[in-house]
Structures are given as structure tokens and as C-alpha cells.
Design a protein with these regions (language model features):
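Beta-lactam-recognizing serine transpeptidase/beta-lactamase-like catalytic domain environment
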Residues: 1-168
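Extracytoplasmic/secreted cell-surface and envelope-processing proteins
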Residues: 71, 172-176
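Short, gly/Ser/Thr-rich active-site loops of penicillin-recognizing serine hydrolases
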Residues: 87-95, 180-191
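Short amphipathic alpha-helical face segments that pack within enzyme cores
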Residues: 55-61, 176-183
Length: 191
């Protein structure tokens, strides 16, 4: 998880109190990655339960890393700033922030994520307009309905956008959040 930037705030151009680190929390406090866990906690964290807290930005960065062959790009919230004449005075520059996985691993994960859309739990996202690659998730929340998660990228063979969607107190990731991602992605791609 640390290789993907969990346990640290992403380098986003926002006030630091507006950014939350993803990771393992207890009682609202971010735990250290070195804090001990029992076998049940390790297993539960592996599929996104227990004390794991992830932000949509963090999960979009995970999807983006897979889309970019293992390289995680530094996120930015403003692409450019123009003066009153329309002249660009500040332009965001793409830069690698981390390399959490090897290219071969990213390729294998991409293939699996394409199958999620074409044959699996993300089939409600499938469209003839573009091949998407995605992963569903359903996070249990004590005292209310689950959080439906969906993260992915498109086009799968030449990614332009990575998106993560969470719909709180709802249903399954593929059933609820997947269609939201599909429509958002189609709009972003102009399709």
C-alpha cells in the first residue's frame, strides 16, 4: 500500500488541510504502516475492509498507475491558468510521482480489469463506444448500507483518463458506481 502512496498526502496543489491521506485508521487517527495487525486484519485489509480508508483520489491514482504501465503521475487540480487576454501564464507539467508496480504487473492488471468490464462484476459499464478497464468494490460500513466503489480508465489500450467513483450508503460497486463511471468517462472522452 505504501508504494501506491497510502499513508501520505498526495502532492496535490490544494491546502494541506483539504487533503487526507489514505491508509489504515483507528478512531479517526491514521495508523503507522508498521503498526502490527493480526491475520484477520491483514486478510480484511487485502480486500478493502477493516480499518482501511481510501479516498477517491487515491483510488484514481491506483487506476492511473496501472494505466500508465506502473508509473503514478503527480496529480494536479488546475491544468492551466490564463491572464485576462487568454495567455497561459501557468501550465501544469506532467511528472512521475512514484513507480509502485512493474510494467508487466501493470499489464496483467489491465488485462484483468478489461475482463471485469467485459465478463465480470463491471459489465454494466460495458459500452460499444470505448473499451474500459475497471475494478469494482463494495465497502461495508457499520450501521448503514455499503459504499459502492468503481475505479478504472479508458480507452484501455491507450488510456486518457482514470476515474474513481464512490456512492455512499448504496449497493454494489458494479451495479451503482459503475454506470456513473461509464457516463463520466464517455463525457470526458467526448463520446
Amino acid at each position: 500500500m505504501q508504494k501506491f502512496g497510502f499513508y501520505e498526502k498526495p502532492p496535490l496543489d490544494l491546502a494541506s488541510d483539504e487533503i487526507m491521506a489514505s491508509g489504515r485508521y483507528e478512531g479517526g487517527e491514521l495508523l503507522s504502516p508498521g503498526d502490527s495487525m493480526d491475520k484477520v486484519q491483514v486478510a480484511s485489509m487485502a480486500f478493502g475492509q477493516e480499518q482501511l480508508l481510501a479516498t477517491p483520489l487515491q483510488m484514481a491514482l491506483v487506476a492511473q498507475s496501472i494505466a500508465n504501465g506502473g508509473k503514478m503521475m503527480k496529480p494536479y487540480s488546475v491544468e492551466s491558468v490564463a491572464d485576462y487576454n487568454g495567455t497561459i501564464v501557468k501550465q501544469a507539467r506532467p511528472a512521475v510521482w512514484k513507480t509502485p508496480i512493474e510494467p508487466g504487473t501493470a499489464s496483467d492488471l489491465k488485462d484483468m480489469m478489461v475482463k471485469v468490464v467485459n465478463e465480470g462484476t463491471g459489465s454494466k459499464t460495458k459500452t460499444s463506444k470505448v473499451q474500459m478497464a475497471a475494478k469494482t468494490g463494495t465497502a461495508e460500513v457499520t450501521g448503514r448500507g455499503p459504499n459502492a466503489w468503481f475505479m478504472g480508465f479508458a480507452p484501455a489500450d491507450n488510456p486518457k483518463y482514470a476515474i474513481a467513483v464512490v456512492v455512499e450508503d448504496s449497493d454494489s460497486g458494479g451495479g451503482i458506481a459503475g454506470p456513473v463511471m461509464r457516463e463520466t468517462m464517455l463525457s470526458a472522452l467526448g463520446l
